[in-house]
């Protein structure tokens, strides 16, 4: 995120918060891996600023994505950080409910949260971070969740961390919240982190070259087959303008109907100028992030046009 954008959004949030004072508590929905041009720890800075506005006596609770880069600043300036439990993500609603119940419990005096994050230097590819099927990360998540509701454990989560960040203290591990029992929080968080470390080699993905992936896909009966170029994921901050997979499809599966997503404003503009049904020749890809490759020449027909807005 640009520094200017972050400052504007942050000031808007803090101004709204200041006008709302006095308040009983704060509940924030965050990601946890935000990076600003001049600031590595977006959420840590934001939580620190929120804490400065509301003071130490107002509870602050936030939800975090499983790929959050949980920093000491985040832990120190929040009373509770509640992690998502599923990947692929499908528990937004229930995670919000758990966070709201945590905040209400603090306000009602039902418990006094103590929170610890323990990390190990492991970066996990999204390919192996799933929680729906059997696998190393799913095992870690089940282990953490099995402790909730026992021995004063209010919440236990496992974080994959965003593997493409380049920041200090990056790592995966466990975050545990207990009812006033710091020793138990430390013990369980460190046990989750240790188990993560013990499974680190199980978390090494088996990846394929584009040509090999296409060959295996063509051997499958039925369809469709999804090829995922994870390093060019727009949701993870990449430009999403790589044409590596598209180029391989043209070379190895030219007769098979295929669909590729490429972010290329210049190419889109040319198609809009040419109009629906027109034949166009253009250079596609690697205009936003040219360090990873060169555009390829493509010729085709404009089948659809849209304004890019979705509902």
Q: Where in the sequence are the language-model features?
A:
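N-terminal glycine-rich anion-binding loop in soluble enzyme alpha/beta folds
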Residues: 1-16, 171, 175-178, 182
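Core alpha/beta catalytic barrel or barrel-like domain that forms the active/cofactor pocket
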Residues: 28-31, 67, 114-117, 159-160, ...
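Short, compositionally biased low-complexity segments
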Residues: 76-79, 110-119, 164-168, 187
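Conserved anion/nucleotide-ligand pocket segment
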Residues: 96, 100, 104-145
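Active-site histidine-anchored catalytic micro-motif
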Residues: 2-10, 17-111, 224, 229-243, ...
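Hard-cation-handling environments
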Residues: 124-311
